[in-house]
């Protein structure tokens, strides 16, 4: 089994990757030569985290070791997020912090989405960065580390998705892992610059995915989370129609006679077909959980956003999911303050959240991204109005989510118990099938005397609600 990586943070929303000191993969030499220790900080989404895990695997295979702390590292790698202004600012803050904490001889490599689109700003603000490596070019990490001069590679042309076999070192707890099945995006939503950053859709081959899936299961992973920019587009760059490639992949995974949870992230409403719903119903190993970004429900706004759906379509698919999979948990994301959004259209969004309560709702203020179609749209909304609408919708969302959670009180559900609460060992934390790691609430366990091992599934009776979390005890 691969050694377990720990997530520690310079800040709480960063993944700071460090290995346990007493473990080393047998195929990688364990040595403690000066100048060979590396440290990763991965920002942003799980897709970025997978890239960091692959880069780390490449370096460990080449004989490098992981430094347990930032200050001990000879090489520091920051995998940035550049999706929104707030994420770019976090990336800049992280670079500044790392530069202030690193030892003088340490080399800093900055990679990821922000490098792809804002490399000039990074070089101008932080001339002491040693190397810039573009998003998706994970195989360039070895060159970046070994280079004796400052350098730059801005290219995502050779993604590891197309490269076949690559090493990877997991940084998640041993019982779950992300599996990226595609990179890039073929859609052109008005507010988004992901196609510019990540390039066009590139699907990973089915056989390679199945090989990785089987490897994860053999390592003891019990929950595999499928990710892509858009799972529903998987295989369409290779000629697949509608959802056929994804359905075929899922069916092949389900042929494996083993217990596991399979979680699907990022499926657009127009891609949730009757066939997918039927497959989810037919095998409980597919978590009754869908991350379905709808962004808005006013048809005029949806059209301006270049979304291939309507309010009527969204209501229809939610209604169908509730009818066919009664215990389904639906996560979505909503944008307030999109150019031209009127108070009446915003109220329509509020009413929708109340009328069609969803289990998890992420709310974002529209970010005016240079290069996006929406950047030049008229009737831009003021920051003050965006902030006001954000807080008003958040208040409604909190009430709706809490009402949904209270319906769970008294139920006995399967929960993977993940460990002690970070603030006290009097509590344990876990998740049920309707909760995805890092983005959703958790189950707080106040009586875990029957828990024999973390990462295992236990039956928990829900007794209370605390904010976005459930409270219960193992029975």
From Swiss-Prot:
InterPro entries: Elp3/MiaA/NifB-like_rSAM, Methylthiotransferase, Methylthiotransferase_CS, Methylthiotransferase_N, Methylthiotransferase_N_sf, NA-bd_OB-fold, Ribosomal_uS12_MeSTrfase_RimO, rSAM. Its EC number is 2.8.4.4. Binds 2 [4Fe-4S] clusters. One cluster is coordinated with 3 cysteines and an exchangeable S-adenosyl-L-methionine. [4Fe-4S] cluster 1 binds at residues 45, 81, 113. Keywords: 4Fe-4S, Cytoplasm, Iron, Iron-sulfur, Metal-binding, S-adenosyl-L-methionine, Transferase. Its cofactor is [4Fe-4S] cluster. Residues 406-475 form the TRAM domain. It is found in: Cytoplasm. Residues 36-150 form the MTTase N-terminal domain. SUPFAM superfamilies: Radical SAM enzymes. GO terms for molecular function: 4 iron, 4 sulfur cluster binding; aspartic acid methylthiotransferase activity; metal ion binding; protein methylthiotransferase activity. Gene3D superfamilies: Methylthiotransferase, N-terminal domain, Nucleic acid-binding proteins, tm_1862 like domain. Residues 171-403 form the Radical SAM core domain. It is an enzyme of class 2 (transferase). [4Fe-4S] cluster 2 binds at residues 185, 189, 192. Pfam families: Radical_SAM (PF04055), TRAM_2 (PF18693), UPF0004 (PF00919). The keyword Cell wall biogenesis/degradation does not apply. PANTHER family: RIBOSOMAL PROTEIN S12 METHYLTHIOTRANSFERASE RIMO (PTHR43837), RIBOSOMAL PROTEIN US12 METHYLTHIOTRANSFERASE RIMO (PTHR43837:SF1). Belongs to the methylthiotransferase family. RimO subfamily. Catalyzes the methylthiolation of an aspartic acid residue of ribosomal protein uS12. This is Ribosomal protein uS12 methylthiotransferase RimO. It comes from Protochlamydia amoebophila (strain UWE25). The lineage of its organism: Bacteria, Pseudomonadati, Chlamydiota, Chlamydiia, Parachlamydiales. The gene is rimO.
């Amino acid at each position: 089994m691969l050694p377990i990586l720990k997530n520690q943070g310079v800040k709480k929303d960063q993944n700071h990757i460090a290995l346990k000191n007493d473990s080393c993969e047998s195929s990688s030499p364990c040595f403690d030569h000066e100048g060979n220790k590396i440290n990763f900080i991965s920002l942003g989404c799980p897709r970025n985290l997978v890239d960091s895990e692959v880069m780390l695997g490449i370096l460990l295979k080449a004989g490098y070791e992981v430094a347990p702390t930032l200050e001990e590292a000879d090489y520091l790698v920051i995998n940035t997020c550049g999706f929104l202004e707030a994420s770019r600012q976090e990336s800049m803050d992280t670079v500044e912090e790392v530069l202030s904490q690193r030892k003088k001889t340490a080399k800093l490599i900055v990679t990821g989405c922000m490098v792809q689109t804002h490399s000039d700003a990074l070089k101008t603000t932080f001339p002491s960065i040693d190397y810039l490596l573009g998003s998706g070019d994970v195989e360039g990490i070895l060159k970046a580390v070994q280079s004796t001069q400052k350098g730059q590679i801005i290219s995502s042309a050779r993604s590891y998705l197309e490269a076949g076999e690559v090493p990877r070192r997991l940084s998640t707890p041993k019982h779950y892992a992300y599996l990226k099945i595609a990179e890039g995006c073929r859609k052109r939503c008005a507010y988004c610059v992901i196609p510019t950053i990540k390039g066009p859709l590139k699907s990973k081959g089915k056989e390679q995915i199945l090989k990785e899936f089987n490897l994860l299961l053999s390592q003891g992973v019990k929950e595999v989370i499928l990710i892509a920019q858009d799972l529903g587009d998987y295989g369409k760059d290779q000629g697949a129609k509608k959802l056929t490639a994804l359905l075929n992949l899922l069916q092949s995974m389900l042929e494996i006679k083993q217990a596991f949870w399979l979680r699907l992230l990022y499926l657009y409403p127009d891609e949730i077909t009757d066939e997918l719903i039927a497959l989810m119903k037919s095998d409980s190993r597919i978590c009754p959980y869908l991350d379905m970004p709808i962004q808005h429900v006013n048809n005029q706004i949806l059209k301006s956003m270049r979304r291939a759906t309507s309010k009527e379509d969204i209501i229809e698919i939610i209604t169908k999911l509730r009818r066919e999979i009664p215990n389904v948990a639906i996560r979505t994301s909503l944008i307030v303050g999109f150019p031209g959004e009127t108070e009446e259209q915003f109220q329509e969004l509020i009413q929708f959240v109340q009328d069609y309560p969803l289990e998890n709702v992420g709310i974002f203020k529209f970010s005016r991204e240079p290069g996006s179609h929406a950047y030049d749209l008229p009737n831009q909304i003021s920051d003050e109005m965006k902030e006001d609408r954000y807080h008003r919708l958040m208040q409604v969302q909190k009430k709706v989510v809490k009402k949904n959670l209270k319906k769970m009180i008294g139920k006995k559900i399967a929960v993977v118990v993940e460990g002690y609460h970070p603030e006290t060992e009097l509590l344990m934390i876990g998740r049920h099938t309707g909760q995805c790691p890092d983005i959703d609430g958790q189950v707080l366990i106040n009586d875990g005397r029957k828990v024999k091992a973390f990462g295992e599934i236990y039956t928990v009776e829900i007794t209370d609600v605390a904010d976005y979390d459930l409270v219960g005890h193992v029975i």
